[in-house]
């Protein structure tokens, strides 16, 4: 695929993405932050890092390459977005070179990458890469759309990116497992293309990041406890086993209040629902991922899968 010409802002985002990748961050570009189906804003770059076994850092980056960047206003906006999303850090990248912009940002715990920094980034080939841009990947997804993959490929991909902001928990873990399953089903049906393989790599990287964040507080626990917590997370979602059992009990009680007891075996209904949960094969994956050795590898594996997803020279696992 030939390299695609990008607009000034898109090019700046790509160069910053490469810059942060080289620093060891997991980076996702152009994420929609929405609420109940309504798009609120875009996060230009989302950074994820693993400073220690028990800490994680998530950062939203605002990139504005306009002649009149309104940098001070962007600092307010970006800091507010960080607080709303519950992230740990935020960064503003701007063409503004005035020193007081950086001072104002530092006062409010916002790192400012000013025009001097961005100019150096633009003038060097240091961070050039044989990677697809986000625009090229999206074009490829649309061009090679095969099968249904649960509907619109692009929509599924955009929602999966959004979940890194909104569902970086076991609900997100289960979403990414489902997306990996759908892509594998697509491949097994004979619909293998660059798009399917790249999506397999990228969804796997999202799954690993979501899992890494979800279990960050488990490192001090014994392995049997970690395995149980991961298994319950995959089986019952973020609310956990206790909350799920409570919902089942409440639902059964509600049915009893509206329907004659002699017409239905409510115990059998409750037992069947629990059986459906128990049928989810989460124990094996939890046993594997719950070991200290594998937990330490999640972030580096995610970085490698992300790289394979964007490499121009695609390596097929099939």
Question: Where are the model-predicted features located?
Answer:
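Acidic-basic catalytic patches of nuclease active cores, encompassing PD-(D/E)XK
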Residues: 1-35
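Charge-patterned, long linear interaction tracts outside catalytic cores
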Residues: 149-225
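Conserved catalytic cores of phosphodiester-cleaving nucleases, focusing on short active-site segments
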Residues: 20, 45-47, 57-65, 78
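Charge-dense, extended regions
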Residues: 249-318
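Domain-level recognition of nuclease-like catalytic cores that cleave nucleotide substrates
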Residues: 95-153
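Catalytic cores of nucleic-acid endonucleases
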Residues: 63-116
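Extended alpha-helical coiled-coil/bundle linker/stalk regions that scaffold oligomerization
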Residues: 194-274
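A short, glycine/Asx- and small/polar-enriched loop/turn
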Residues: 39-43
């Amino acid at each position: 695929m030939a390299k695609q010409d990008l607009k000034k802002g898109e090019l700046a985002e790509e160069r910053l993405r490469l810059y942060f990748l080289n620093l060891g961050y997991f980076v996702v570009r152009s994420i929609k932050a929405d609420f109940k189906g309504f798009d609120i804003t875009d996060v230009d770059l989302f950074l994820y890092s693993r400073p220690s076994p028990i800490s994680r850092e998530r950062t939203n980056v605002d990139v504005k390459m306009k002649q009149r960047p309104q940098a001070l206003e962007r600092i307010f906006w970006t800091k507010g977005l960080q607080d709303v999303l519950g992230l740990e850090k935020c960064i503003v990248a701007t063409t503004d070179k005035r020193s007081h912009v950086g001072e104002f940002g530092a006062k409010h715990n916002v790192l400012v990458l000013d025009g001097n920094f961005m100019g150096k980034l633009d003038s060097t080939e240091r961070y050039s890469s044989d990677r697809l841009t986000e625009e090229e990947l999206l074009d490829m997804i649309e061009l090679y759309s095969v099968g249904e993959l649960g509907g619109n490929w692009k929509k599924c991909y955009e929602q999966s990116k959004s979940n890194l902001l909104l569902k970086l928990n076991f609900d997100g873990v289960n979403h990414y497992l489902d997306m990996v399953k759908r892509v594998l089903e697509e491949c097994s049906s004979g619909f293998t293309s660059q798009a399917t393989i790249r999506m397999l790599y990228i969804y796997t990287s999202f799954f690993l990041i979501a899992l890494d964040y979800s279990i960050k507080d488990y490192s001090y626990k014994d392995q049997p406890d970690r395995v149980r917590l991961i298994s319950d997370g995959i089986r019952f979602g973020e609310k956990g086993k206790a909350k799920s059992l409570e919902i089942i009990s409440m639902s059964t009680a509600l049915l009893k209040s509206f329907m004659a007891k002699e017409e239905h075996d409510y115990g059998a209904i409750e037992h069947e629902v629990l059986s459906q949960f128990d049928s989810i094969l989460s124990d094996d994956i939890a046993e594997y991922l719950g070991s200290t050795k594998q937990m330490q590898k999640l972030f580096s594996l995610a970085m490698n899968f992300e790289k394979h997803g964007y490499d121009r020279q695609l390596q097929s696992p099939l």
